[in-house]
Amino acid sequence: MLRRLHKDQPASFAFTEKNLEWAQGQISKYPEGRQASAIIPLLWRAQEQEGWLSRPAIEHVANMLGMAYIRGLEVATFYFMFQLQPVGSVAHIQICGTTSCMICGAEALVAVCKEMIAPSAHAVSADGKFSWEEVECLGACANAPMAQIGKDYYEDLTPAKLRDLIGRFSGGEVPVAGPQNGRYSCEPLSGLTSLKDFESGRTQYNASVQRAVDLGDTVKRTLGTEVPILTPWLQDKVKA
């Protein structure tokens, strides 16, 4: 599928101070002459900062890595995880439409997005807050149907639950990620049938959901100040 850059482009791009520090740390993983290997994480951080990848962002990353612009464009246009057009200021919603989710009602979730956000995928809502698309398998088949909103998975969705999530996000809330039907992780809907006496170390949330709760806001743009910058391969101390 041919993918093109958006017709409207910003004049420039620059990483925030902390994101630049993070990017330089990633580049330092690779030996001299091999810095181009860092292109995917750097493009991803540029997208996390801005919400999408603009031409200035792609060219900025290419310059940092000593790459021809066309090489950066080849990578950015090849991988569908890179958004080449503006997305909603609050959240970009990705509905999984592959087999398990399709069977369990993904098409009804797409219908909600068309109604509440925009009739077409990748279009931004009238208030500028949301955009959406249907994507291939996101790997949470046991919790189908599901969607990725920002950095997190919202699972076991129904049209009503997705409507509620969009409304809460629109109001400034960040709903707790994970299953939306009350079950823990991907345990059977009817509850455990075996190993009931085994101490699993279960807490209020499973590990990935707990991480989202700890971060607090997993749909906001990444500025680089959210977590410590770690460069253990340099054998240095944790940078605040």
Language model region names:
Residues 1-240:
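Signature of N-terminal electron-transfer/Fe-S-associated modules in redox systems
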